[in-house]
């Protein structure tokens, strides 16, 4: 994992694999990933013109930060408003499909943070879209913390390539096909190596469902991630639909 992905701009990086090994064998993928993605609105994704949100993260004693994002999935345009790695304010817009022509700050700090924050915000979609990741339904297990049971679906990324190769996201999926809890296991040596977090605070913006509240621990330290100011703009409209 590149150094920029460790605690980029004081952020908390749990990046999915983007640059994947060439010609890997087809992974085993449970149909539950599609069911989960449909619950979150993946069938209406083509209607989404833009998404905006603020990713707020805190690990007690390590950092507290807020990143404001606006993303146009169809064009690849990303706009960021927040601190750089030294805490200085940054405001920048760029084309995420043309990273080679961007500044080092965008390539090494802003884009890795965007990937991290976007995975927290939309992981049910990314887990479905990332076809190189394996996913096998393990059946019902007790939740890692608290009462209750859910379907355990580990989403494992290939060992080669990406920001954090070999990462595993253990999703705990409820009867309604919503993620209720997850455990993140880093494939590399950089901390944090293990994260436990709830998936609660569900809100809907247009056709897209978001989990906005995540509490747990990162290597034993208290963790709080929450997604605020979520809104979606649909194709053909200038109106932002706030999550409720």
Feature annotation, model-predicted:
Residues 1-10:
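Bacterial N-terminal signal peptides that target proteins for export
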Residues 12-21:
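Hydrophobic h-region of N-terminal signal peptides that target proteins for export
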Residues 66-71, 89-97, 106-116, 195-198, ...:
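Short amphipathic beta-strand/extended segments with alternating polar/hydrophobic composition
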Residues 31-105, 133-142:
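N-terminal mature ectodomain segment of secretory-pathway/periplasmic proteins
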Residues 45, 69-73, 120-121, 169, ...:
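Tryptophan-centric aromatic hotspots in well-structured domains and transmembrane helices
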